[in-house]
């Protein structure tokens, strides 16, 4: 990774090099946090005895918050000191993770009352709210500091580093949870502190907003204007509309199956934490190898065509997951239950993970001007929130009525 970083930085202009270093550091720290979050749903149903619908809500929160972007967008436009604001967002949304240190370490407590489940859900609702500010801001910062030809490549390098850290942390965290089912009570506070540090690093990336003369309006009128702007972007930019239609159909499929997959791993396959860590993250080994290649491809290819890789691989890994219920053959290696059909699931998921992280995070930036990158990403994320209203819980309902397959 150090060799890759050195070779990249030799070919970059000063501003790009500074941005790349900060974004790389941010991505590495976020990789640690995401490695912990990779097992969050499984922790919720296994260690905290959460119900199926509560599990669906936990996942739903991570996407549903994007509905608020229509309000947050207008609020952000009124913030002149965005760097300071970004740091406060990091503190306010990451600090509640420290409260998990005080959670009980007894299974009886979680089985006999739902109050701890509600507190857990509330903590992560606050955590996910940060994405309303951070996700569009990342696109804005990078699009205005990276050249068009380097944008996809540099982003893929940072994501490769992110995936390496995520991979290692998830496996180690899975082993730790097998030894101590309540290890989350002291791991999440560490993640909270690191989350504040990562957002601080992100806020150090240079950005000078363009001088725009704005007509003073009420906040309500501004929200209405924001909705109209989203509508006009979709109406007038046909390629972007096609991109979002494809994403809407994909997103419904992804959201309806995500929480059910966790239940399937726990109830149907009887996996321990280490095995779940393998299946939910082993595909990142392939994703790490593919990301630099996919980053270069995305810089040269229409994102709508690039999406074919993502959607096809999603269908592939769901197919092999379904097949496991009919061909439940496995072997045990070092305490890991290796299902033969799930090997192909991991391969398909590797292609999905490598392509989706690029398409979902920066795909929208290719359809507008540099200073519109945050607006396009906000529209993209808002539509994510729209499908999150119904898709995750619909998946739980369908599973309970009809079964896994």
Task: Describe the role of every protein-language-model region.
Residues 51, 80-82, 147, 181-183, ...:
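A helix-boundary/kink motif common to multi-pass secondary transporters
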């Amino acid at each position: 990774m150090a060799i890759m970083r050195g070779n990249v930085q030799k070919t970059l202009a000063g501003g790009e090099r500074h941005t790349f270093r900060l974004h790389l550091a941010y991505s590495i720290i976020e990789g640690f946090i995401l490695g912990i979050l990779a097992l969050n749903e499984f922790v919720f149903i296994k260690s905290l005895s959460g119900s199926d619908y509560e599990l669906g809500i936990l996942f739903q929160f991570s996407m549903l918050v994007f509905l608020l972007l229509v309000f947050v967008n207008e609020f952000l436009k009124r913030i002149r000191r965005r760097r300071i604001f970004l740091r406060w967002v990091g503190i306010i949304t990451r600090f509640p993770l420290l409260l998990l240190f005080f959670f009980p370490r007894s299974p009886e407590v979680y089985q006999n009352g739902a109050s701890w489940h509600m507190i857990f859900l509330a903590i992560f609702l606050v955590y996910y709210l940060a994405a309303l500010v951070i996700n569009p801001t990342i696109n804005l910062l990078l699009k205005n500091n990276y050249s068009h030809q380097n944008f996809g490549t540099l982003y893929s390098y940072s994501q490769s580093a992110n995936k390496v850290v995520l991979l290692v942390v998830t496996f180690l965290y899975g082993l730790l949870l097998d030894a101590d089912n309540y290890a989350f009570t002291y791991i999440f506070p560490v993640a909270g502190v690191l989350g504040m540090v990562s957002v601080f690093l992100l806020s150090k990336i240079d950005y000078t907003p363009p001088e725009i003369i704005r007509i003073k309006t009420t906040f309500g009128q501004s929200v209405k204007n924001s909705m109209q702007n989203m509508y006009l972007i979709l109406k007038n930019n046909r390629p972007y509309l096609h991109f979002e239609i494809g994403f809407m159909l994909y997103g419904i499929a992804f959201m309806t199956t995500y929480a059910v997959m966790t239940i399937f791993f726990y109830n149907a396959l009887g996996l321990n934490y280490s095995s779940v860590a393998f299946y939910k993250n082993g595909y990142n080994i392939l994703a790490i190898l593919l990301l630099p290649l996919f980053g270069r491809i995305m810089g040269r290819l229409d994102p709508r065509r690039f999406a074919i890789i993502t959607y096809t691989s999603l269908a592939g890994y769901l197919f092999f997951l379904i097949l496991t219920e009919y061909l439940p053959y496995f072997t045990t290696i070092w305490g890991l239950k290796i299902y033969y059909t799930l090997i192909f699931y991991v391969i398909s998921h590797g292609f999905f993970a490598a392509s989706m992280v690029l398409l979902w995070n920066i795909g929208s930036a290719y359809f507008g001007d540099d200073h519109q990158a945050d607006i396009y990403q906000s529209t993209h994320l808002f539509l994510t929130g729209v499908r999150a209203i119904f898709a995750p819980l619909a998946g739980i309902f369908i599973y309970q009525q009809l079964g896994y397959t």
